[in-house]
Amino acid sequence: MTNIRKTHPLTKIINNSFIDLPAPSNISAWWNFGSLLGICLILQILTGLFLAMHYTSDTATAFSSVTHICRDVNYGWIIRYMHANGASMFFVCLFLHVGRGLYYGSYMFPETWNIGIILLFTVMATAFMGYVLPWGQMSFWGATVITNLLSAIPYIGTNLVEWIWGGFSVDKATLTRFFAFHFILPFVISALAAVHLLFLHETGSNNPSGIPSDSDKIPFHPYYTIKDILGALFLILTLTLLVLFSPDLLGDPDNYIPANPLNTPPHIKPEWYFLFAYAILRSIPNKLGGVLALVFSILVLAIIPLLHTSKQRSMMFRPLSQCLFWLLVADLLTLTWIGGQPVEHPFITIGQLASILYFMILLVFMPIVSIIENNLLKW
């Protein structure tokens, strides 16, 4: 008799995705981040659900409801800080996951890659709206500045912004709808993640060498389940240390001041994981140009498969491309630093140079260096 695990319609899906899934024998710890992102998503949905039980999406009471959660709700403080820092862990895993995809040529699975880009945009939108909910100074002014960017869209811009706001400024209507969207989007993300996985399992996983691994597969369980559990333990340990020892390390102190439309904070900046994009936005003096650069800084990932000129899929055996990749990482760290600095000399110039370099590496240097490497192989 065949095992029920392999025959029952429900368990069969789980079996084919997480148990009997044929996986390459040589995938490294860089392939852990998919499962870690799944864990982050589950954690965020659960902590968010418990926070939503006590939160009120009204401008008069939003700030005090968050204070109430931290002070009066049983273990409310740990739920709130796990949710806030869980978002940071989510983005750490996301950036490493995307970086892995760039390094090892995982973008050569176009459907999986494109759904991944949609997921990245959706997660960024969710995180932005979540940051508005505590209704502190940075929440309010962040919402005002970022939504205002849409007014740069010709002809319909102003109407669009007022439609999103639900009035003539960020107010009660804005907060209520942001809460509604922030609640529903994680479930959209879950559905997209399932589709992401569906397309991945159509082709099978890539591996560090970039060479097809059909001749050498091993079952996902127990080999990679145990490996993923180790990664999950590291993730939970890091998150726990962050939550229990320095929960406000990655936050902004200004967000402990209730939102005041009459008082602008000295430096309006988003959470750390958006700073690289914020730096690119600010480095262009024109409003519409800045918005386009901001969107394109993520959307550029969609055209990377078209710019793949190398004969090899992975960067494992391409030292020149590796140098460029790590230059890109350094450039993104520079942009993140610049995004948190005030708009003054020398930060403006550094930000502009780093922004130009970011697009140049991805759109110009990578394809050219790949062609050079192809020619070096002939020698």
Curated annotation (Swiss-Prot):
SUPFAM superfamilies: a domain/subunit of cytochrome bc1 complex (Ubiquinol-cytochrome c reductase), Transmembrane di-heme cytochromes. A ubiquinone binds at H201. Heme b b562 binds at H83, H182. Signal peptide: none annotated. GO terms for cellular component: mitochondrial inner membrane; respiratory chain complex III. Its cofactor is heme b. Coiled coil: none annotated. Keywords: Electron transport, Heme, Iron, Membrane, Metal-binding, Mitochondrion, Mitochondrion inner membrane, Respiratory chain, Transmembrane, Transmembrane helix, Transport, Ubiquinone. It is a multi-pass membrane protein. InterPro entries: Cyt_b/b6_C, Cyt_b/b6_C_sf, Cyt_b/b6_N, Cytb/b6-like_sf, Cytochrome_b, Cytochrome_b_C_euk/bac, Cytochrome_b_N_euk/bac, Di-haem_cyt_TM. The chain crosses the membrane at residues 33-53, 77-98, 113-133, 178-198, 226-246, 288-308, 320-340, 347-367. Pfam families: Cytochrom_B_C, Cytochrome_B. Binds 2 heme b groups non-covalently. GO terms for biological process: mitochondrial electron transport, ubiquinol to cytochrome c. One of its GO terms (molecular function) is metal ion binding. It comes from the Eukaryota. Heme b b566 binds at H97, H196. Belongs to the cytochrome b family. Heme 1 (or BL or b562) is low-potential and absorbs at about 562 nm, and heme 2 (or BH or b566) is high-potential and absorbs at about 566 nm. Component of the ubiquinol-cytochrome c reductase complex (complex III or cytochrome b-c1 complex) that is part of the mitochondrial respiratory chain. The b-c1 complex mediates electron transfer from ubiquinol to cytochrome c. Contributes to the generation of a proton gradient across the mitochondrial membrane that is then used for ATP synthesis. This is Cytochrome b. It comes from Neovison vison. The lineage of its organism: Eukaryota, Metazoa, Chordata, Craniata, Vertebrata.
